[in-house]
């Protein structure tokens, strides 16, 4: 599926403001970007899993054991962040399928190509995101 999308999009294609916003080619471009990102995360996670399985369970030296446990904790937190990112990628792919990708979930306005290229899982315009973060900060400070 990814190879078919790559062929239809083209190797050097980058979405442009000169095109119709979220036309079929742009949607395919972002679908390709998201699928490649998801694959790279899966590949990295497999390496992490292998490291955890290969790592010594019982280090004879207490310092070595503490170091291994710290490394494991970091690996597991990284995997948790990756799991959450994959959920965001899957959500973005569903929005593409539903015809909602590229539009702010709060205002319905276009998110913008530059923002989506930088952060393909973005669900809000910069302005809506900033307002959301301000509200979160205020509620945390209370």
PLM region spans:
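Short cysteine-rich clusters marking metal-coordination/redox-active sites
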Residues: 104-108, 125
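Short functional micro-motifs and their immediate structural scaffolds
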Residues: 111-112, 133
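Short Cys/His-rich "knuckle" micro-motifs
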Residues: 114-118
């Amino acid at each position: 599926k990814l190879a078919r999308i790559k062929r239809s999009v083209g190797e050097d294609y980058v979405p442009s403001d000169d095109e119709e916003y979220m036309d079929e080619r742009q949607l395919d471009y972002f679908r390709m970007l998201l699928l490649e990102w998801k694959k790279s995360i899966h590949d990295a996670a497999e390496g992490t899993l292998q490291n955890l399985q290969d790592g010594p369970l019982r280090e004879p030296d207490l310092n070595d054991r503490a170091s291994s446990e710290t490394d494991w904790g970091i690996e597991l937190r990284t995997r948790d962040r990756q799991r959450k990112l994959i959920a965001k990628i899957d959500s973005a792919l569903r929005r593409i399928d539903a015809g909602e990708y590229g539009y702010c979930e709060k205002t319905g306005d276009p998110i913008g190509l530059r923002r989506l290229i930088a952060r393909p899982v973005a669900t809000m315009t910069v302005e809506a995101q900033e307002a959301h973060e301000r509200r979160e900060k205020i509620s945390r400070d209370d």
